Regions:
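Glycine- and acidic
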Residues: 41-43, 60, 205-207
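Structural motif
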Residues: 45-54, 182-185
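Short, flexible active-site loop motifs that bind/organize anionic cofactors or intermediates
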Residues: 46, 64, 90, 133, ...
Length: 243
């Protein structure tokens, strides 16, 4: 793991002052992804290596850091930005949309390795920040599907979103004048369930479900998952809050 002494943990002002490329460099250096890279490289074997596994993975990370909401936007950024291509590890050649889509499909087949990377990062935070995980909060967030409505055609062809369904969240509060308000949000897609450190606002455990899955049901599942994967944090937690 690379050490960058000039940056202190949670010094967000320092991170925000960095450019996108520098932030991406930090992500690439600190990401505990070696096991996943070896698995993907072994699967590729001695086949064509037009777009190296590690370069493709770094490009995927770049899409997250640069907040691109589609593969097409990321690939256009790679095409115009030589520094980004170099940092990712491409030797001047930008992946085709088909090649990148195929790589994403490969990564999705290795959810266990991806979740282990996440757990490793959480454990590293626990080592560095002694009170990390003492104050926990649980919540969920709507993730809209690209499809406007649930697809009635259940035949899988690699293009349709067959797993998305409908969800609803109700928000309530009180105005300054004492009157009550209510806001109902409906969407088609998924739901991201999170257990986070309430002090540092960093995730500790997560799951993604269909939008219709009730928060309370998945909360029990997340706590069981946390007991299995992060037992020390759960044992030392003092507070768990939720809506």
């Amino acid at each position: 793991m690379a050490i960058i002494p000039q940056l202190s943990l949670f010094a967000w002002e320092e991170i925000e002052e960095l450019g996108d490329l520098e932030r991406l460099r930090l992500v690439i250096e600190y990401m505990p992804d070696e096991q996943l890279m070896r698995v993907l490289e072994k699967e590729r074997g001695k086949g064509r290596d037009d777009y190296p596994i590690r370069a493709m993975w770094n490009a995927l990370l770049a899409g997250i850091v640069f907040q691109h909401d589609s593969d097409a936007k990321l690939l256009r950024e790679l095409a115009r930005n030589g520094q980004l291509r170099s940092l990712c590890g491409f030797n001047g050649k930008v992946p085709t949309p088909w090649a990148f889509s195929r790589f994403l499909h490969k990564v999705l087949m290795h959810q266990a390795e991806v979740e282990e990377m996440f757990d490793d990062l959480v454990r590293e935070l626990k080592k560095i920040v002694p009170d990390f995980g003492k104050r926990l909060a649980i919540d969920s967030k709507a993730i809209k599907s690209y499809a406007a409505k649930k697809n009635k055609n259940e035949k899988e062809d690699g293009r349709r979103d067959l797993d998305a369904d409908y969800g609803k969240k109700v928000y309530r509060g009180t105005r300054e004048d004492g009157t009550r308000w209510e806001k109902i949000v409906k969407w088609c897609g998924y739901k991201l369930h999170l257990i986070v450190d309430a002090s540092y606002e960093l995730p500790i455990m997560f799951s993604v479900t269909k939008a219709s899955v009730p928060d309370i049901n998945e909360a029990h599942h997340l706590l069981e998952k946390m007991e299995e994967r992060q037992p020390e944090i759960l044992k030392k937690a003092e507070i768990l809050t939720g809506d």
